[in-house]
Amino acid sequence: MMKKMISAVLALTAAVIGHAQHWSYNESAADWDPSDFPQTPYEVSGQVHTATVDQAREWYQAMARQFPDRCELVDMGPSDAAWPIQVFVISSESSDPIKVLVNNAIHPGEPEGVDACMLWVRDVLLVEGSSACNQVEYHIVLHYNVGGALNRNSQSRANQAGPEVYGFRGNSQNLDLNRDFIKMDSRNAESFERYFSRFQFDYFIDNHTSNGADYQYALTFFFTHADKLHPALKDHSLSLEATLRQDLFLEGWINAPYVQTRDHSPESGLVGFFETGRYATGYTALHHCIGICVETHMLKPFPQRVKATHAFLVAFSNRMATESMLREFQDLELSLRRSFSSDPWVQAGDYLPIRFELSTVPSDTLDFYGFQHGYRSSAVHGQDRLFYDRNSPQTFPVPYWNHYLAVDSARVPRAYILPRGYSREVLERIGRQRGVSVVGITKDTTMELTVSQLLSMKTSQQPYEGHYLHSQIQTVEYSRPVRLQRGDMLIKVTPENALFLVNVLEPRAPDSYFAWNFFDACLQQKEWFSDYVFEDMAAEWLETQPLVKEELQAKMKANPEWATNAGAVLTWVYQKGPWSEPSVNEIPIYRLY
């Protein structure tokens, strides 16, 4: 028996080693030494490898040593791996600068931003006369997903042309960190939130590689959807996006919105990507920071994708450095400050949208630079498969659906109140947010508050990012006296934090804390009954409640099969009577109007 067990262990070990060897690689070509500075690891490799976590840190340390008065390398905070998230900060000459956060390697298999940022930083700091940072302060995240960046391989990005070696999408918990900004299951997200709140950034750039259709563009990007932005930011965001597209086009970079097709191919039209708070740019928008997601095309050679990302950074920084942008930003900043104080853009009793649906009417028509596509028989499964003919470039008009309509809204309260028992799961997440303060109630009291009762919802049958996400949530709201205990937590709603709080505390919002399972305990009944004990109690109670008894008899007559289920009938009576638990399906998020 022991020999059989040893043989089985050895066989399993061989299988595991065999699988690990499938993700093996040789990175000798990417050797980089600080003596190579100011060349980047990407350049030393012959433009075939992306910088590792160690190489990026050493390169930026060398840059910080050369320009100690202008830049520094700092820790954003811990990650889920053993290494912290690091940020390279280029200071501004202005006392009140525009603040920009650039994020790289949230998906480490999409690493263009890592290398493009090094090239851009070198341009800014080593080229005399650069005005990029005269009025702008840049914070550049080296590798946000440190754990995924350390898990390097050459196989996991099957649809991508290089680099030869790259990181993995999942972090050290196997989480997709670009779905974690509301639920904050990772230490990465906690560190991001603290850093983001501390510096109160005005713009956020998230660098990615696309998946999906084939087309001529190396560069696509989208701005966080204007339909859900603070009104003061909407026009500015739309104007800046249009200006950047034109600037890039004049520099020879044809570009398009992120290519999300309505059907299988671009000819069917494009649909604007709507990011809720789980995504990085969706999260920053909830805090009045304009987010931009850069998506270079997966099938373009890695050097071309790095150049495309670099071109976007150059276009953005050049635009930020103009006097007209400074004046526009100063006006915008003043407008925002007024909307948070003397002229509030939202007040208690107003309604904020929490759920959007795509308009059925196209908002624009785009000239799309694509390839002719067709179908042919698959050599794998024998069915028709899609293919693109890169020898047949085409430009053709496509409809663009990019307008989203609010289909649900929530009334803004003066404050939310949560039981202290939710301090670990919910209150700690809320208390760290920008512009949010949480205070404890000092004594037991009873208040008339508004609560939500769950009517229906759907729950995913498969785990999604460590949760079983709720969707299509329907509730009914009502007021009742609520007994509050000393230590329960009050969260004041202000014009600055209302957008965030409504989107996480209103249960029907798609990325609410309820949707992410933080209140699932309220969905379970805690006390029950023994049939033989409850039979007599139920009969006696029904005799005192003739209307309920009449309702029961009508229900049994209308549903004969149900009437034969004794347990179901007793449960119905139990839930109608004084024994039912009012807390079941009542979501313990209280609103004070």
Predicted stretch roles:
Residues 2-11:
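Sec-dependent signal peptide recognition
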Residues 420, 428-432, 439, 443, ...:
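Catalytic centers of hydrolytic enzymes
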